[in-house]
């Protein structure tokens, strides 16, 4: 049961981290000054 809880928490934390990273990187990535970081 502990392994199941840890796996669920890890998946939830992974999706939250991806969502937060995509939300923070979406606006600066569209500006011409930050285009060099996308390569």
UniProtKB/Swiss-Prot annotation:
A Gene Ontology cellular-component term: plasma membrane-derived thylakoid membrane
Membrane-spanning intervals of the chain: 6-26
Membrane topology, record value: Single-pass membrane protein
Secretion signal span: none
One Pfam family cited in the UniProt record for this chain: PsbI
Subcellular location: Cellular thylakoid membrane
Xref: InterPro entries: PSII_PsbI (IPR003686), PSII_PsbI_sf (IPR037271)
Domain of life: Bacteria
A Gene Ontology BP annotation from the UniProt entry: photosynthesis
Keyword tRNA-binding: no
Keyword annotations from UniProtKB, A to Z: Membrane, Photosynthesis, Photosystem II, Reaction center, Thylakoid, Transmembrane, Transmembrane helix
Similarity field: Belongs to the PsbI family.
NCBIfam families in UniProt: PRK02655.1
Assembly behavior: PSII is composed of 1 copy each of membrane proteins PsbA, PsbB, PsbC, PsbD, PsbE, PsbF, PsbH, PsbI, PsbJ, PsbK, PsbL, PsbM, PsbT, PsbX, PsbY, Psb30/Ycf12, peripheral proteins PsbO, CyanoQ (PsbQ), PsbU, PsbV and a large number of cofactors. It forms dimeric complexes.
Function of the protein: One of the components of the core complex of photosystem II (PSII), required for its stability and/or assembly. PSII is a light-driven water:plastoquinone oxidoreductase that uses light energy to abstract electrons from H(2)O, generating O(2) and a proton gradient subsequently used for ATP formation. It consists of a core antenna complex that captures photons, and an electron transfer chain that converts photonic excitation into a charge separation.
Protein name, as recorded: Photosystem II reaction center protein I
